[in-house]
Amino acid sequence: MWPNGSSLGPCFRPTNITLEERRLIASPWFAASFCVVGLASNLLALSVLAGARQGGSHTRSSFLTFLCGLVLTDFLGLLVTGAIVVSQHAALFEWHAVDPGCRLCRFMGVVMIFFGLSPLLLGATMASERFLGITRPFSRPVVTSQRRAWATVGLVWAAALALGLLPLLGLGRYTVQYPGSWCFLTLGAESGDVAFGLLFSMLGGLSVGLSFLLNTVSVATLCHVYHGQEAAQQRPRDSEVEMMAQLLGIMLVASVCWLPLLVFIAQTVLRNPPAMSPSGQLSRATEQELLIYLRVATWNQILDPWVYILFRRAVLRRLQPRLSTRPRSLSLQPQLTQRSGLQ
């Protein structure tokens, strides 16, 4: 607990920022435009997904369910966090004046962790689903129902929410961050802050790493099967190419947007001497770095829907006409059937 000589809640740290500086940093027009573009992009992706899910194969349908959960998560994340940030930027209200008990700050901290970690976990889940579908087609049910796919999405959401609630249970703290328009985990040296910061950064980093590993194996397997099969043994492969292209795009976007923030959090909480003073102050350079990395991470919510929109078969065929003329292909089942017969 930082001494502040007042009845304010524990989410307030000593700050030294003027109103004029806040006006220069917190532009309501930029924040509003960012949110509008992001919300419109995700709505467009959801409408395209709704049409794509009709008449698709069972395998592709389950993948599209996970993708729908990802886009829905990004949409709700922009909607909830954007409403708070844009309101603060427009009114430039003092957080301690409207939220002395830190209820709004805790709520925003939870949703920031939830909507930050959920896309990373969903990306790893989608990579796992495609990995099993490509390399172990007989080790899972032939048909993954939409109900089961949505149940998996629900479990991912529950795991992300459970992590976000930990500071409310005593592990870590949510505090108002520079320039006073948002709340996030505390980059302090106390054991709870360090543990929560490392837990968040490690889970996010492991999700990205797992996605990279599984996607690499899946792509290598697809390439091996494509070059090793005869045309007579093949069946349509365009959907496999489409799903892997989308999955690789999602992984690349998540890596570029989130890894800098995750690495920065881990480095800051482990820094010796501590980055945060005993009074709760961070250097202005550290606060500005955190804000920059956070803004980079939020681009993930805008770019995710465009990965799906641009990496559809209709677009890929324009970039690579061979996709629309090549023979039917890419099933691992003929090879596996032959191997079973030989054994």
From Swiss-Prot:
Any GO MF annotation of the entry: thromboxane receptor activity
One GO cellular component, as annotated: plasma membrane
Residues carrying covalently attached carbohydrate according to the record: 4, 16
Family matches, as SUPFAM superfamilies: Family A G protein-coupled receptor-like
Locations listed in the record: Cell membrane
Topology in membrane: Multi-pass membrane protein
Key words of the record: Cell membrane, Disulfide bond, G-protein coupled receptor, Glycoprotein, Membrane, Phosphoprotein, Receptor, Transducer, Transmembrane, Transmembrane helix
Segments on the Cytoplasmic side according to the record's topology features: 53-66, 129-149, 220-246, 312-343
Subunit structure: Interacts with RPGRIP1L. Interacts with RACK1; the interaction regulates TBXA2R cell surface expression.
Task performed by this protein: Receptor for thromboxane A2 (TXA2), a potent stimulator of platelet aggregation. The activity of this receptor is mediated by a G-protein that activates a phosphatidylinositol-calcium second messenger system. In the kidney, the binding of TXA2 to glomerular TP receptors causes intense vasoconstriction. Activates phospholipase C and adenylyl cyclase.
Descriptive protein name: Thromboxane A2 receptor
